[in-house]
Amino acid sequence: VFAYAPHYEKLEANAEKIGFVPCKDLKGLTAKADTLVMACKPYQIEGVLSEIKEELKGKALISIAAGWNYDKYEEYLDKSTRFQFIMPNTPAMVGEGVLLFEEKNSLLPEEREEIKKLFEALGIVIELPVHLMGIGGALTGCGPAFVDLIIEALGDAGVKYGVPRKQAYEMVSQMIIGSAKLQLETGEHPGVLKDNVCLSLIHISEPTRP
């Protein structure tokens, strides 16, 4: 695995920790690889593509940058460059992410299967048509921020009543993990699961009633 970043010293330090080969030159990196992952900020993509467009000919490009889907890349890439847009989320950092694969792509079938296997190590892979990638990204990409807000708020409530902060966050985070796993494994409607809690703990039913 080869990697390039503008700040070589930082890249080199990370290479020792993670185990990849750092490259000082973007074009040199592109020449060495058959499949490349575009992981820079969206505003940087146009500049990167202008530098390596020729080197990308005949290669596969995977992009995880929000806002740049297949149709947008098609405007900049040579027709021989194969492409796939993937939208990950932050829980992928711990192997529990949601990886949204845009159905529209130009990868070879065997390439796409290899890429899916690679990203499955980071979480669950879900394929979506082009018109659903926006809302899908909002749900899975922005959703973690709302969950973090809940963790913070419930944790603060625990702290207010004497629970140590670290323990409060641990309790709330595990509760969310367990609740999510219960829904995934049972397939029950979230409303049914909510009612089950309210029936067993009747004193919380009023605040959760619409």
Question: Residue spans of the language-model regions?
Answer:
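Mobile late-domain/C-terminal helix-loop "cap" segments
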Residues: 183-194, 198-200
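Short pre-catalytic strand/loop immediately N-terminal to key active-site residues, enriched for Gly-Thr
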Residues: 83, 133-138, 190-195
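NAD(P)-binding Rossmann-fold cofactor-contacting core
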Residues: 1-14
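Conserved small/polar residues in nucleotide/adenosyl-binding loops
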Residues: 202-210
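Rossmann-like NAD(P)(H) cofactor-binding subdomain of soluble oxidoreductases
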Residues: 8, 18, 26-101, 105
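Internal alpha-helical scaffold of NAD(P)-dependent oxidoreductase catalytic cores
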Residues: 72-82, 98-136, 146-185
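Aromatic/hydrophobic pocket-lining residues that form π-stacking "cages" and hydrophobic walls in ligand
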Residues: 11, 154, 204
